[in-house]
């Protein structure tokens, strides 16, 4: 079973709080955070790892468990395979909702996905559908470990309950 947690990282925008958590990070994660220019980006990077470590500790999850992290705006997301099955692939994505760029959808989504967006009655519903496809597609791409190297139009999301690839 894969479980997902969301955390608000705004407290990490305060330097003294960030520093307190930063000091607990492993060296490789500190290096990653240190390469980032803006405090908000450093807080996202550190916050995602801190969330993962809290989950590992609380649920006694080994480091072998598949996981995936995402961040956007003031939030970080962490999905973890609770059963630690080596075959499990985990991907997650979170996005701050802005205006939907239909040119992006037309260029990168499958025709059926783009058409589903256009069928929505108004811009708000189109935006919501755009982001629904976006986070599902990016989550899948991350789970495959190919990330953005995988062409978004090379696979189709069919919205049902649950979504189907």
Residue ranges and their predicted role:
Residues 1-165:
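Core catalytic alpha/beta fold that binds nucleotide/phospho-ligands
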């Amino acid at each position: 079973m894969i479980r997902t947690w969301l955390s608000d990282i705004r407290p990490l925008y305060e330097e003294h709080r960030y520093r307190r958590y930063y000091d607990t990070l492993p060296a490789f994660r500190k290096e990653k955070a240190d390469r980032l220019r803006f405090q908000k980006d450093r807080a996202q990077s550190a916050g995602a790892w801190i969330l993962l470590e809290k989950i590992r500790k609380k649920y006694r999850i080994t480091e072998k468990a598949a996981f995936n992290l995402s961040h956007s705006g003031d939030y970080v997301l962490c999905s973890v395979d609770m059963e630690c099955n080596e075959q499990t692939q985990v991907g997650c994505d979170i996005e701050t909702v802005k205006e939907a760029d239909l040119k992006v959808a037309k260029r990168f989504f499958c025709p059926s996905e783009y058409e589903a967006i256009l069928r929505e009655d108004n811009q708000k519903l189109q935006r919501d559908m755009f982001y629904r496809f976006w986070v599902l597609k990016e989550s899948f791409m991350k789970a495959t470990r190919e990330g953005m190297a995988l062409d978004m139009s090379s696979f189709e999301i069919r919205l049902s309950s649950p979504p189907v690839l």
